[in-house]
């Protein structure tokens, strides 16, 4: 699979909800700015932050498992955590049934890639959702398929 432009396009065109692990309530941080920008362009965000509270107007879940227990299917999991934590997040994403894992710009993990790809997840690393959206001219979310996989993708 890998993080080719085709995979990036499949993710950006196939999902309209982003579960953001490491989402921040601080508008000065990329972990707030990027998902907030995606939200303004029509994507729904599900923040995951161990502090809970409200982030970008949405209730933050403390873990991916807590989000899943609250009825939030992970689908696309966007990661704003250090590279050293990415494999743990990948395992959690697989455990809750995610179908795509995106490691933001600066986050690289061969272990996370192996975990995700072995489980059949689409995988991207070291790229920014917002930058890629603009670069590829995709100003709207996917075709309203919610948190599920892209058309024709089983998982």
Q: Which sequence ranges carry the predicted segments?
A:
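Conserved beta-strand elements of the Class I
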Residues: 18-19
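Rossmann-fold NAD(P) dinucleotide-binding segment
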Residues: 85-104
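NAD(P)-binding Rossmann-fold cofactor-contacting core
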Residues: 24-29, 35-56
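Glycine-rich, highly charged phosphate/nucleotide-binding loops
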Residues: 1-4, 54-87
